[in-house]
Amino acid sequence: MANPLYQKHIISINDLSRDDLNLVLATAAKLKANPQPELLKHKVIASCFFEASTRTRLSFETSMHRLGASVVGFSDSANTSLGKKGETLADTISVISTYVDAIVMRHPQEGAARLATEFSGQVPVLNAGDGSNQHPTQTLLDLFTIQETQGRLDNLHIAMVGDLKYGRTVHSLTQALAKFSGNRFYFIAPDALAMPQYILDMLDEKGMAWSPHGSIEEVMADVDILYMTRVQKERLDPSEYANVKAQFVLRASDLNGARENMKVLHPLPRIDEITTDVDKTPHAWYFQQAGNGIFARQALLALVLNSELSL
């Protein structure tokens, strides 16, 4: 049947309705269970990373290859005409779009991915991260992992820990989970890195329950998902960072009293906010979460590049 995501730009998680999200996640589950190595056999996809990336770039490019697509692109703009000759982003995208069927793009500037859609013609642009703004495919793999481990995306208790002010992953994930009913949010962060007011206002408008907390221990017994993030040293003065760093570290001993099926997630890279002894517990799920990026990104590529998709 025809799908609503065909040739659609995916720049923000808000570009996807609840039905769209369910379609992507259902497609991801099918591709995980039944690989389709020739689904995009005659497609060419540009992987345009204007800033360095490890997991996102490798995950996207692996997804492309495993669906049979041809991949062109670059992992650093320094050696492109844009980096060396001063070509504009508009011209770069205008040219690349004449070569390929889709563009996957990461850029350090907020709004760059949305700008690219103005110059890509009918070629869909998939945002792989634009500054501290949006990272929709990270949110898709987060949702896929939550649904896979909890069996649902509604009536969940979700704690988010660390840098909630600048962390684009927690902004997008909160916006996505707010599309599903009955979810409750616990925000655990220092005052200087608290969740932005616009996110809290959005939750209030939707009638979603949320509360701020000063420690992980306060909520451990109540949550289904503990979503950890890295507190960035450069965001705080040295004395405050030392306090915060110690306060927002998860250790295996902190998991005593957690719900049996509670999962710890993290967008990675992890520095020292999750100690390695957590890795050995059944709650640790961040490496499986990263692996699910393959299937979430495969699903999105398959949907934007096929007017009809039957798996």
From Swiss-Prot:
Gene3D superfamilies: Aspartate/ornithine carbamoyltransferase. It catalyses: carbamoyl phosphate + L-aspartate = N-carbamoyl-L-aspartate + phosphate + H(+). InterPro entries: Asp/Orn_carbamoyltranf_P-bd, Asp/Orn_carbamoylTrfase, Asp/Orn_carbamoylTrfase_sf, Asp_carbamoyltransf, Asp_carbamoyltransf_Asp/Orn-bd. The keyword Transferase applies. Its EC number is 2.1.3.2. GO terms for molecular function: amino acid binding; aspartate carbamoyltransferase activity. Pathway: Pyrimidine metabolism; UMP biosynthesis via de novo pathway; (S)-dihydroorotate from bicarbonate: step 2/3. Carbamoyl phosphate binds at residues 55-56, 106, 135, 138, 268-269. Keywords: Pyrimidine biosynthesis, Transferase. It comes from the Bacteria. PROSITE patterns: CARBAMOYLTRANSFERASE. GO terms for biological process: 'de novo' pyrimidine nucleobase biosynthetic process; 'de novo' UMP biosynthetic process; amino acid metabolic process. The keyword Transferase applies. L-aspartate binds at residues 85, 168, 230. One of its GO terms (cellular component) is cytosol. Heterododecamer (2C3:3R2) of six catalytic PyrB chains organized as two trimers (C3), and six regulatory PyrI chains organized as three dimers (R2). Belongs to the aspartate/ornithine carbamoyltransferase superfamily. ATCase family. HAMAP family: Asp_carb_tr. Catalyzes the condensation of carbamoyl phosphate and aspartate to form carbamoyl aspartate and inorganic phosphate, the committed step in the de novo pyrimidine nucleotide biosynthesis pathway. PANTHER family: ASPARTATE CARBAMOYLTRANSFERASE (PTHR45753:SF6), ORNITHINE CARBAMOYLTRANSFERASE, MITOCHONDRIAL (PTHR45753). This is Aspartate carbamoyltransferase catalytic subunit.
